[in-house]
């Protein structure tokens, strides 16, 4: 598997500890000692997960501090969007929207957009993604 590929990136962040390290780096611009202590993981776990994040091109190290690469920032944004889809009852709202997936003759685009807008009024990003899909 190529190091800089979608399957590799997904494989790296599918590990809970690696994902926690990745998110902590994004949120704190943390120094390596603080990261390990904050996450309560062993030295071996930490370096193993950091190695995967570095190889996948998601993080970089400068002066003992880790930060996200541009690719890492894109992946972080996608991860946060997905996490938000599972939080704040959004999952059930998305399931409700799925239940309205009927043939276009039964539910117009405007009606679909209105349902999405109403259910996801508090989450603009997910709402905008779904409305763009309806409009395409």
Where in the sequence are the language-model features?
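A short, conserved structural fragment
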Residues: 54-65
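A short acidic, leucine-rich amphipathic alpha-helix
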Residues: 21, 33-39
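Short alpha-helical segments that sit at the start of domains
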Residues: 1-20, 108
């Amino acid at each position: 598997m190529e190091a800089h590929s979608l399957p590799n990136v997904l494989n790296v962040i599918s590990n809970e500890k690696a994902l926690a390290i990745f998110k902590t780096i994004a949120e704190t611009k943390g120094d390596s000692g603080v990261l390990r202590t904050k996450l309560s993981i062993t030295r071996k776990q930490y370096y193993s997960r950091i190695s995967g994040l570095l190889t996948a091109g998601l993080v970089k190290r400068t002066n003992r501090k880790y930060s996200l690469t541009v690719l890492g920032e894109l992946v972080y944004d996608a991860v946060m969007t997905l996490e938000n889809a599972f939080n704040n009852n959004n999952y059930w709202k998305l399931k409700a929207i799925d239940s309205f997936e009927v043939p276009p003759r039964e539910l117009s685009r405007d009606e679909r957009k209105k349902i999405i807008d109403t259910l996801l009024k508090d989450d603009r990003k997910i709402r905008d993604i779904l409305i763009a899909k309806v409009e395409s």
